[in-house]
Amino acid sequence: MKLKSLIVGALAIAAAAACSKKPAELAQGPWLGVLVVDSTEQGMEVPFNMNVYKTAAGLDSVEIVNAGEKIAITEITRSGDTLTMQLPVFTSEIVAVVGADSLKGCYYPKGKENGTCYKFYAVKGITDRFPAATEAATANIQGRWEVIENPGTPDSTVMVGEFKQEGAKVTGTWLNTGGDMRYLEGKISGNKLMLSAVDGAHTLIMTGEVTADGKIANGKFMGSPKWKSVWTAVKNDNANLPTVESLIHLKKGPKTFQFACVNLKGDTVKLSDNQFKGKVVIVTASGSWCPNCMDETRFFSELYTKYNAKGLEIVALCFEGKDLESSKKAMERFAKQTGANYTFLYAGPRGKETKDKVLYNLEGQVAFPTSIFINRKGEIVKLHTGFSGPGTGEHYTQLVEETTALVEKLLKE
């Protein structure tokens, strides 16, 4: 649904406010934000909910809400009418002119320094994520679905959709072999499905139509101007993804692993260093740009805090920009904002060539993140590719329980 027409009046007010001598206050309460990720895609603007409030110190604070997730933006600066909001964990930021009850500006998915701008609009007082879709829901998609992305093409992929529906409101996620799409929220209007998410890494919009025979057809997906697909889905309570064991395995040869990468100080760190000898080590292929890596890092941070004194070490091999200098700031921010105190190393530029070189003895799907579990003898005992985060509910709970049990078992050996 095209949302721009709903906020034209509010933006006119913003222009008038900009002409006044006193900068407009950022109004407290609920807001609806909209990102125009690709202006050539009509009806695919990406809406998201925001709440604005004052902290105890009287400072502006903004909260982005996607289904069960609340993302607090506390790094906010103001220069005249211009507001800059740095989203947590990642390098994305919003720069907008403040009107009486509106905002207008840019969402920079990789930070203002990168220069890529998605047009950003927001208006106060709207809580409906898709307010132009007013028809009562005539379909219910509660449950599990088998999702086919790009059906009938060489790029065809099977995923699992899990949704909850209350009235017209729909929440849920898509699970795939690399992880999940995190927290999706939207609605059904008539038979039309609309879902979106904005979390600092993702800018997602999904649409589709529930057919008379209960399928979902004419699905469209967009995550960026270059990340687009079509999809269909059928209800399937038994829909499942391939097992991790079928996706990734070790090449023939020694069941060991070695790395030599630089830390944030530029010093070379090796798995053969004394720091890791006789320890249980988790090595994870990660990246400061990766939302599923963020979810894994937060969990691994808890594991490290609980078990480091008992002999657990965790190393994140980060695949980033062209060199450490250009990647250091994002890596430091990622580690700090996820609360991770374990070892972060620069593994090289993001890309298949570097990944294949660093993770030299892994075969199959090596997604971000991919984790290697190593016992006290230095032997690889388990590989895990992808990460199903907290947005997947019971899948996340099961993964946390299984991983924790494995770590405890290895520490006792």
PLM region descriptions:
Residues 222-262, 274-278:
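N-proximal helix/coil linker or "cap" segments that precede and/or mark the start of modular domains
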Residues 1-30:
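Bacterial Sec-dependent N-terminal signal peptides
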Residues 337-340, 346-406:
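Thiol/disulfide oxidoreductase modules built on the thioredoxin-like
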Residues 269-294, 300:
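Short active-site neighborhood of thiol/selenol oxidoreductases, capturing the structured segment around
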Residues 25-98, 130-133, 139-211:
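Central antiparallel beta-sheet cores of small beta-barrel/beta-sandwich binding domains
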Residues 295-339, 350-359:
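Structural microenvironment flanking redox-active thiols in thiol-disulfide oxidoreductases
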Residues 116-149, 244-250, 256-258:
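Surface-exposed beta-loop interaction hotspot
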Residues 111, 276, 387-390:
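A short acidic/small-residue loop/turn micro-motif
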